[in-house]
Amino acid sequence: MEELQLQGYLEKDGSRQQNFLYPLIFQEYIYTLAHDHGLNSSIFDEPMEIVGLGYDNKSSSVLVKRLITRMYQQNSLIYSMNDFNQNRFVGHNNSFYSNFDSKMVSEGFAVIVEIPFSLRLVPSSEEIPKSQNLRSIHSIFPFLEDKLSYLNYVLDILIPYPIHLEILVQILQCWIQDVPSLHFLRLFLHEFHNWNNLITPTKSISVFSKENKRLFRILYNSYVSEYEFVFVFLRKQSYYLRSTSSRAFLERTHFYVKIEHLIDVCHNHFQKILWFFKDSFMHYVRYKGKAILASRGTYLLIKKWKCYLVNFWQYHFHFWSKPYRIHINPFSNYSFYFLGYISSVRINPSAVKNQMLENFYLVDTLTQKFDTIVPVIPLIGSLSKAKFCTILGHPISKPIWAELSDSDIIDRFGRICRNLSHYHSGSSKKQSLYRIKYILRLSCARTLARKHKSTVRNLLQRLGSGLLEEFFTEEEQVISPIFPKTTLFPLHGSHKERIWYLNIIRINDLANYLDWS
């Protein structure tokens, strides 16, 4: 019902889609949609208690109506930001700081902000229906395997957060022309933690990202989209700066002439001249806040790329990116964590015996191969954060699941185990997954024992030890989307066979915990 109301609102007039999003903030069905989205959260999310109100996180129509009434009363503040310090959006009782109000406002506003983005994506998804497999996360690894084996250096980049909140609002102006909605967003961001300083502490940004996940993802993705759009544009322009003469002096002259022409074109984006350089063997891959920039060039060239990125964030987004967030490493002796895998370029020496007439000689050859393995220690750390084990890897019970039925408990643990086996099927060393499966199996047994107020030994004697053992060691038949034939792929039978799936559209929750920790 709520989706039909929203669709009818958007179909009335095309101009209203962009210029009149603000009235949706006062519609109750928007917050119902936001609540329905929250019900589809990860199984690792814990139910939250609303501090000071005594309610759980279930949507209450009464509370939503009260929230909308308070926002109506404060409507005049949306248009007068000058008296921000004298007038408070929350009213006199500071109820806005409650978890319910802040979460519902942020989730509801995120639903509204997603409208312009979804309208742009619908036509493109209908035009290219055959590219669904490109959405798979695993499709990135065959690309890395094909390209990175021949490169020399890699930039391991942690994309910095924009410090000033006004930068995020200005970026959204390119997508949303509704001025009242932007003022409302600006007011909410500043009111959330009273961010009046130019430099916001990292801790505050971290708290905001955890308590308002959906809105934070919208803001962060819009910022990353803007950064990559400008970065890729400048990268393409620098790639076409080809020399037109064979002489070194003339090459240098023509190069700087083209540089000056490009600076005139990009003058609106930069306040200071940035030096461009040519690197035709550069590859860029990103997922969330982690990016990989690999090059076949020399150390001096990759160092220039690092300086360029630091200056890029400084002059285009007006904030300082700490240089230690960008690491330069050679592929020959470096492993980087990306998308839940520890990846590296492994050098395999081999000797070939050749014969010429009656003489034999050996030829030593070196081959480079892109390798991916399961990060056991980070996975144990993620299991520890999710309360499945201690930091040392000792299994513990999951108290919050003890109230479920036995079948639901086993199903949840089994689903986690199967998802891990499925997601890490591209590892060349799958034996390390046995330890993770052991932790989950024993944690499941202890959770069942906690529910029945018994010990693990007595529980297994009563229910039978073969129940969990048979469930967690079940072999699966896996059809590889890369190889033309169907193969049997038991987890314990093929330790070095790597299979990438084309139906995985999101990173595993345990690996996701590590990326955002």
From Swiss-Prot:
Keywords: Chloroplast, mRNA processing, Plastid, RNA-binding, tRNA processing. Coiled coil: none annotated. GO terms for molecular function: RNA binding. GO terms for cellular component: chloroplast. It is found in: Plastid, Chloroplast. GO terms for biological process: mRNA processing; RNA splicing; tRNA processing. The keyword Isomerase does not apply. InterPro entries: Domain_X (IPR024937), Maturase_MatK (IPR002866), Maturase_MatK_N (IPR024942). The keyword Metal-binding does not apply. It comes from the Eukaryota. Pfam families: Intron_maturas2, MatK_N. Usually encoded in the trnK tRNA gene intron. Probably assists in splicing its own and other chloroplast group II introns. Belongs to the intron maturase 2 family. MatK subfamily. This is Maturase K. The gene is matK.
